[in-house]
């Protein structure tokens, strides 16, 4: 068997039609937010480890560089440094927080511990004009998060703004700019204006990163890479794999064979919807495999969430290998991997400073003896970008607006061993949650809402009889890109209806709890 060969060409959707910037990640908790704000301005960007070599980036032809914040102090011996190519490139540079201090330190300024640390809201006052602050008032609110500060500017730099505790809240020398505050967070209300000023006025970028331009470029790159070979696609029916299927089918037609594997781990009615949309509506040569018993046997006795993910990923690939042998040859395996999947898995392409959170079965959970090359045309996209592309490709709204669903399915919404009984419980509870949230008209404002079966029993009283039954947790969150999420403040009467229906309509459940934890510290899924 050949080794796993990740996709290359179509992972980086770049061409002269896309202006781009590079974000060097120094470990900031806000690094992904910088990328989101840049994409919101319709400029393509990639977030890469701070020590990435220029040779790995020059294909992007970036028009600017952003240095993220980070937890280190620039004067420490082992602190992350500025790659020499950044200044040698002659490109505009925007340093944020640690990035600003790194610019100052590298170019001859002085950075020292602040006498008074700044964490939280602050007001900065402009003291000089610069394109980065075009259209901003003399004083504006920002978000600070730093324990060091610049005590002396590097030669040739001028101070642009100051705050009560930071005499150099912003600095610049021509196209080299530093901001001590964080323009990427919502607590800096005018931060998007500042970032757009950098992108458009300083870097000279054009807002050409759109769904239309991406689709045009992706189709061209898929055709170039695939040639006359055939592609096998893992179709789950979720937004990601559905958009990947529609995009690849638009590019190469029936060279694509979408495979839907009914693992028995899907939501109620999901298998029927997939067959209807892709088999009959899009007229794709859909191959449907009933593997429910196969996956249940593989998961028997397994409770560890990482082991579940790996076993499911391995079994998926074995199914695809069997299809490839019977209907092949296929050279490529296509997946709907997104940028947050890559970042959370700390897979190749994600920041080296990011700790591994969990294995996504379509990233780190794949066996290393995979017999295909991976084709992942959405690998550098966020969820909202994928939805926009799905609409452009003509996917029905019921697919485009479908809430995210984990690759391992309900297996990671059952804490503990996956059994037929547990699946029946969580599937029915999840259906009730979806029905009630949608009936309340709240689904469009939520990122995800679902039920989780907990590995505990609870004492209760039902029909004058003592019960000792299972517990369901309800999870509902708001988010824009899954990188951060807040628990949803659902109305109490809705929560009451959910609890009442679940304990009365789902056999084996006598208690319902509501998860009020945000991300971070928790992840959206429980496993």
From Swiss-Prot:
Keyword Protein biosynthesis: no
GO MF, one example: GMP synthase activity
Keyword annotations: ATP-binding, Glutamine amidotransferase, GMP biosynthesis, Ligase, Nucleotide-binding, Purine biosynthesis
GO CC terms in record: cytosol
Catalytic reaction annotation: XMP + L-glutamine + ATP + H2O = GMP + L-glutamate + AMP + diphosphate + 2 H(+)
EC numbers on record: 6.3.5.2
Domain GMPS ATP-PPase: start-end pairs: 209-402
Pfam families registered for this protein in UniProt: GATase, GMP_synt_C, NAD_synthase
Enzyme class at the top of the EC tree: ligase
Binding site for ATP: 236-242
Pathway per the UniProt entry: Purine metabolism; GMP biosynthesis; GMP from XMP (L-Gln route): step 1/1
Residues the record marks as active site: 97, 182, 184
Domain (Glutamine amidotransferase type-1) ranges: 20-208
Entry function: Catalyzes the synthesis of GMP from XMP.
Subunit record text: Homodimer.
Protein name: GMP synthase [glutamine-hydrolyzing]
Taxonomic classification: Bacteria, Pseudomonadati, Thermomicrobiota, Thermomicrobia, Thermomicrobiales
Encoding gene, per UniProt annotation: guaA
């Amino acid at each position: 068997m050949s080794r796993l060969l990740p996709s290359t060409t179509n992972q980086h959707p770049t061409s002269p039609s896309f202006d781009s910037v590079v974000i060097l990640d120094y470990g900031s908790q806000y690094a992904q937010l910088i990328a989101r704000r840049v994409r919101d301005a319709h400029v393509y960007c990639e977030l890469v480890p701070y020590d990435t070599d220029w040779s790995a980036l020059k294909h992007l032809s970036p028009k600017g560089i952003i240095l993220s914040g980070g937890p280190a102090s620039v004067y420490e011996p082992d602190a992350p440094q500025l790659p020499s190519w950044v200044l040698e490139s002659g490109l505009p540079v925007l340093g944020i927080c640690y990035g600003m201090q790194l610019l100052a330190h590298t170019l001859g300024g002085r950075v020292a511990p602040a006498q008074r640390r700044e964490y939280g809201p602050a007001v900065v006052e402009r003291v000089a004009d610069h394109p980065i602050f075009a259209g901003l008032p003399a004083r504006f609110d920002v978000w600070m998060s730093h324990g060091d500060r610049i005590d002396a500017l590097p030669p040739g730099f001028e101070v642009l703004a100051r705050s009560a505790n930071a005499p150099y809240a912003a600095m610049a020398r021509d196209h080299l700019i530093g901001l001590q505050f964080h323009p990427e967070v919502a607590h800096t209300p005018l931060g998007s204006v500042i970032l757009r000023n950098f992108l458009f006025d300083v870097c000279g970028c054009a807002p050409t990163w759109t769904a239309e331009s991406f689709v045009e470029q992706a189709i061209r790159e898929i055709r170039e890479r695939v040639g006359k070979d055939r592609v096998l696609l893992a179709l789950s029916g979720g937004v990601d794999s559905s958009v990947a299927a529609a995009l690849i089918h638009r590019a190469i037609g029936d060279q694509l064979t979408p495979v839907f594997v009914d693992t028995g781990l899907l939501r109620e009615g999901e298998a029927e919807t997939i067959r209807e949309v892709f088999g009959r509506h899009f007229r794709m040569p859909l191959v449907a495999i009933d593997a429910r018993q196969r996956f249940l046997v593989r998961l028997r006795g397994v409770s560890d969430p990482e082991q579940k993910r790996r076993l499911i990923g391995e079994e998926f690939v074995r199914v695809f290998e069997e299809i490839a042998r019977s209907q092949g040859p296929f050279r490529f395996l296509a997946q709907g991997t997104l940028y947050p999947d890559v970042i959370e898995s700390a897979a190749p392409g994600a920041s080296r400073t990011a700790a591994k959170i969990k294995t996504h079965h379509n990233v780190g959970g794949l066996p290393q003896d995979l017999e295909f090359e991976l084709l992942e045309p959405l690998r550098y996209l966020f969820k909202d970008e994928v939805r926009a592309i799905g609409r452009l490709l003509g996917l029905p709204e019921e697919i485009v607006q479908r809430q995210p669903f984990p690759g391992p399915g309900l297996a990671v919404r059952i804490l503990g061993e996956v059994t037929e009984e547990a699946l029946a419980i969580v599937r029915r509870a999840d259906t009730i949650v979806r029905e009630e949230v949608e009936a309340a008209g709240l689904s469009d404002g939520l990122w995800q809402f679902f039920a989780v079966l907990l590995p505990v029993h609870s004492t209760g009283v039902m029909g004058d009889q003592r019960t000792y039954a299972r517990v369901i947790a309800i999870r509902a969150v708001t988010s824009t890109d899954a990188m951060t999420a807040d628990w949803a403040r659902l109305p109490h009467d809705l929560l009451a209806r959910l609890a009442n229906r679940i304990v009365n309509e789902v056999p084996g459940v006598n208690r319902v709890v509501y998860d009020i934890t945000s991300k971070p510290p928790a992840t959206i899924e429980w496993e």
